[in-house]
Amino acid sequence: SIETIRKLPKMYFTNITGGEPFIRTDLKEIVRELYKKSDRIVISTNGFFTDRIVDLCKEFPQIGIRISIEGLEQTNNEIRGLQDGYQRGYKTLKTLRKMGMKDVGFGMTVQDKNAPDLVPLYKISDKMGMEFATASLHNSFYFVEAKNIIHDRPMVAKNFENLVNELLRSNSPKKWFRAYFNHGLINYI
């Protein structure tokens, strides 16, 4: 609630996630209150509600948006259970970039089903000049989920290794730090 947000201490970074944050009718109010508490806000979304996302970004152009795309088109749509999920997310990314949003990018939770898409999806994001954030499949105490398991760890690790090598080929220190983070994910899985 807004009252709860008002009680929060000062924060450096806030990630609004879900479920899907853009189904909330009070998301603008939440963001407005959080900016009183947080220096940086990023919203993780499936990118399905392009119009709502664009509307929020017009009011808060400094906000970060990460579209959760779980692989190339077929893989993403299978994992997300949305027939046009990839295209809708991709369209939202392009729309945000076209309107001048700077803190925009892909977010991918890596698992057995999508690990082979890790480097190809990174290359798409890199070509678009966007951020590429990764996470490893994990269980959550908050959602009482204990069946998220990576079954083929060597294969997933190899794909993370390939991503690390791609990131290290760049001239960007930020990408080198992302390589370090992704190398750490190999140990986590």
Where are these regions (language model features)?
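Radical SAM enzyme [4Fe-4S]-AdoMet core and its adjacent flexible, acidic
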Residues: 33, 37, 63-70, 74-189
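Conserved alpha-helical substructure of the radical SAM core
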Residues: 1-63, 141, 152-159, 163, ...
